[in-house]
């Protein structure tokens, strides 16, 4: 530790320290007289003043990530000192707060979850990757199929725009299932944006945007392997390999295999807690670039998902077998050209294109009761042009074409086919005034062959009130087409009959139902500071989503799922406070509280949405030891979540009246993990989820039907069925 002492002399030395490449100031760098303990710190703008000493005329200037500079002071001229950055690929720096962080200076409420954060839990796939995140909730769609879904801002995940590498590809028939088809070990980072978000990816964002960035050429290792085994009978093997063919061409190959063979009924309701089956998934990705500003990104992915759910055989009840088989493949191509200005009056520009095609096949069978099959084919074409208008502003505009073809068959209701074609333009203007005021304004204007002209405006603003203190305000419109079966796949795991009340004056609408449309507005106050000389911060946000049109799913009807257009108001209001700080070196605490009120005008009155916790507390503790034996360390992570009671569907008048409470009990979920890591080589991890073994005992309601089949309803899942789950895993990396 260097003791820094100010020396007052009659002719102090003054100067500024800059990054040699970017010419940006280097804040708080160390300036000392060479060979002494006499020195000072530069201020936030890189300026420094240091008193002279009679025994030395050479200054040593140091900053993390840069080479030291030695400057001989010969006169009283103010100094400009340029530091050269080190080769960061050769540095091994442990970033104490780099695993999950808010972007305070972004006009959106934008959060990044890195690969290191995902390693704090098992995170077998994207649907399980939010266990250590306070903004996104994970839950189950029903008590039989084991399908996981997410919620944002008190709304189902179908109202969030889900993307892979900035391409919306978890939508339509795979809005729910698609989350489980992104293996966690393939993920480099996840970007989460609350609110309507940017207009450039599309109009389907209402509650937020989630973008998954896959691993690629930037990987440090040549080969990565992840193996996982859990006591629930689940086993996984994942690989990622990186290859080079010359300086400008890189490609990587990803594989995933998962097997579930545990036939457990830990809550003793007569049904398997998780389905049994297999998943095969593979992805080939290639990246091409040259010295003229061109970058190409291409990928092809295919998967097969086969599972079976139903009765466990532990109780004397009629046998139920539900088969769920899914196939999906997609091809994506992105090209970009960056044009550097050749003259002083030229503007920096870039052009980008996206071409994406995907096909999904879905087959669901509950023999004698329900059969569903669906096929979705999607083609997306995008052209974007970005130009730097001046030092403060940038304009991005472009053209978009979307072609969606759906063929669905649901027994006993028949065939549902639709063909959606959307084309139009979009533009987004970004203005940044001295990094103190920032505005992003955008809009889309498109023509939809079924719903007509669509105008989608959005606005995000940020004001810096003081150093580290930012106020944000945002608003925007979002819309989507409802998929009444695959938006609520838990409906298939019940004897409920679907009743659709169509709009008689709009025969061109799919099933006679309108496009869902909502305004989202939010305000955010964030503060980044230092506590105990370490990074700390707090973010407080409030959002309200007001639906102008909505397809209401009414579960409060005996034996029915009623589907009808909103006739009144539907408003979701949320408020959240999240703070993090580090009381000790390598020890971080993250805490959050969230409040939700979600009210809907159903056809028989206003009430809250089911399966929404009004209050939720969240705490995550992370600690890592010092390195020992050169490059090893222990990592400890603990996450605690308290969920308030949730309103359950109404059973009045049904054969199961009184068998479920009106509101579920509140409960804690405690997860923990211990890892032994050898830096950049391997990790061995051991974890437990639901430490206190809380489980929902009555998740499925059933009775014998008059025709020998079973009447059942599994749409009451508010908590885990399996209880405590432990797992062990290995992450192994092969360096260059």
Language-model-detected regions and their locations in the chain:
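C-terminal beta-signal and adjacent terminal beta-strands/loops
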Residues: 642-651, 674-736
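Extracytoplasmic beta-strand/coil segments of soluble accessory domains associated
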Residues: 51, 127-171
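Membrane-embedded beta-barrel scaffold of Gram-negative outer-membrane proteins
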Residues: 249, 350-364, 464, 470-472, ...
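N-terminal periplasmic accessory domains that precede
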Residues: 76-82, 126-129, 148-151, 163, ...
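Short acidic/polar hinge/loop motifs at secondary-structure boundaries
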Residues: 48-51, 167-194, 282
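Short, acidic, small-residue-rich periplasmic hinge/interaction motif at the N-terminus
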Residues: 18-22, 29-34, 62-66, 74-119, ...
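Flexible loop and strand-edge segments within Gram-negative outer membrane beta-barrel domains
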Residues: 260-281, 287-351, 356-377
